[in-house]
UniProtKB/Swiss-Prot annotation:
Assigned protein family: Belongs to the bacterial ribosomal protein bL31 family. Type B subfamily.
Database matches in SUPFAM superfamilies: L28p-like (SSF143800)
Pfam family, one: Ribosomal_L31
Keyword Ribonucleoprotein applies: yes
Top-level taxon of the source organism: Bacteria
Protein name, UniProt field: Large ribosomal subunit protein bL31B
Keyword terms, alphabetized: Ribonucleoprotein, Ribosomal protein
GO terms, biological process: translation
Keyword hit for Transmembrane helix: no
InterPro entries: Ribosomal_bL28/bL31-like_sf (IPR034704), Ribosomal_bL31 (IPR002150), Ribosomal_bL31_B (IPR027493), Ribosomal_bL31_sf (IPR042105)
Subunit structure comment from the entry: Part of the 50S ribosomal subunit.
GO cellular component terms, A-Z: ribonucleoprotein complex; ribosome
Amino acid sequence: MKKGIHPENYRPVVFKDMSNGDVFLSRSTCSTKETIEFEGETYPLVKLEISNTSHPFYTGKSKLVDTAGRVDKFMSRYGNRMKK
């Protein structure tokens, strides 16, 4: 790697997929205050809503991901109309 062109905080970081609990180690400049112990070392933790281990394109399975209650909100507004 060339000197002086990479950010100073480029370091190993653990990413955790919150939809299935999968964790993996990579390098990143993401800033976070959370840490996790992974393979005997302590690393910064970045939480992901979806990753390649849970995304339908990579898994081949369709899955509903409701991160902000959008489906519940829709069903409370329009759910009764569909049943008629």
